[in-house]
Amino acid sequence: MPGLIDAHSHIGGIRRSVLQFDDWGLRATLAYGVTTVFDPSSLSIDMLAYQDLIDAGQVIGPRLYTTSTAMFSYNRLRSLDDARDLVRRYRDFYRTRNVKQYRIGSRRDRQWIAMATRELEVMPTAEGAVDMKLGLTQVLDGFSGNEHAFGVFPLYRDVVELMARSGTSS
């Protein structure tokens, strides 16, 4: 069997500290057969250093991908151009093709992020925050991922069909 992929892994043990070249958490992840992890919102840019160290063989661990830090409301967007600039900075400086907005602001702000990511060929994901209305509007606006459950059970056919037709993961 090829390695497992953890598509929502917050590698907490390697955040906000001096880089460790012998991290037990990364080794344990491999020991359980997980060879690739994706962190949809690392709390620091340390993940970029770990990506490089793993790729260079300096640290033993699974292939590591991340959105880097999430886009928060302090990124005051005033226009679609501001959103393009923000997405471009993430894409170029964090070397990522995935970005996560974490309740960046109004729905208009989220729509600008969705439009900018489409234009710049970056995949947008969003913090669902267990809020049904927020989650559904993010799906309708074009986000490819909703990182947490809707928080409502059961989901009725209209929501299930919306998710299936949109291709949005949750």
Feature names for model-found ranges:
Residues H148-Y156:
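Glycine-rich phosphate-binding active-site loops on the catalytic face of alpha/beta enzymes
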Residues G3-G12, F21-A126, V130, G135, ...:
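Divalent-metal coordination cores built from histidine and acidic residues
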